[in-house]
Amino acid sequence: MGQKVNPKGLRVGIIRDWEGRWFADKNYLELLHEDLKVRKFVKTKLQQAGVPKVEIERAANRVKVSIHAAKPGIVIGRGGTEVENLRKQLEAMTGKQVAVNIVEVKKPELDAQLVAESVAQQLEKRVSFRRAMKQTVQRTMRQGGQGIKISCSGRLGGAEIARTEWYSEGKVPLHTLRADIDYGFAEANTTYGKIGVKVWIYKGEVLPAKKVAQVEGGK
């Protein structure tokens, strides 16, 4: 099953945390849709900034939105004007008090979502899919990735029949739950139709902290 399931979802609660941290009773559906709306709005508005992840925390009538961005300068704007405008728009959308936090993505080459979006953009610019995949894999491995797999699916190179091609380097142990594997998906809208891009990046193992045995008095 490791081959089929989303590696992020499989590892939630084991080595990965939730991206939406809140509890709800009867208004769960309402808040979930609000989360989806906020994420879609932020991703669309900050397309140039490279936003792989938006974390949302809620407490009473307050919402904390943490935006992970490869180019935080674009999100913040000159003198913080852009981030302030964004906060006001989110407050108008949710009707709640919103705090916006910007987190910089230090190595965009090791973020699967950003890598997938980068490959999709190259495909839209008519770059050969093999070249796009190969160069991206090399860049990720140079930045310290332990393994990467990229899969492109659709009418590759304008072929009549759709197919799936993939390229990988290093190792990507999908069944190992302690393996820190990032997964990203993006779509390239080409003149021949959509091409789906999936990326798996293995960053190493996350080992649990050793428990120190407590010694009781005199023993």
Curated annotation (Swiss-Prot):
Q: Name one GO molecular function term.
A: rRNA binding
- GO CC, one annotated term: cytosolic small ribosomal subunit
Q: Record's Pfam families?
A: KH_2, Ribosomal_S3_C
Q: Which PROSITE patterns match?
A: KH_TYPE_2 (PS50823), RIBOSOMAL_S3 (PS00548)
Q: Does the keyword Transmembrane apply?
A: no
Task: Keywords in alphabetical order, please.
Answer: Ribonucleoprotein, Ribosomal protein, RNA-binding, rRNA-binding
Which GO terms of type biological process are on file?
translation
**Domain (KH type-2) ranges:** 38-106
The reply to whether rRNA-binding figures as a keyword in the UniProt entry is: yes
Q: How does it assemble?
A: Part of the 30S ribosomal subunit. Forms a tight complex with proteins S10 and S14.
Q: What family does the Swiss-Prot or TrEMBL record give for this protein?
A: Belongs to the universal ribosomal protein uS3 family.
Q: What does this protein do?
A: Binds the lower part of the 30S subunit head. Binds mRNA in the 70S ribosome, positioning it for translation.
| HAMAP family recorded | Ribosomal_uS3_B
| Name of the protein in question | Small ribosomal subunit protein uS3
Which organism's genome codes for this protein? Desulfitobacterium hafniense (strain Y51)
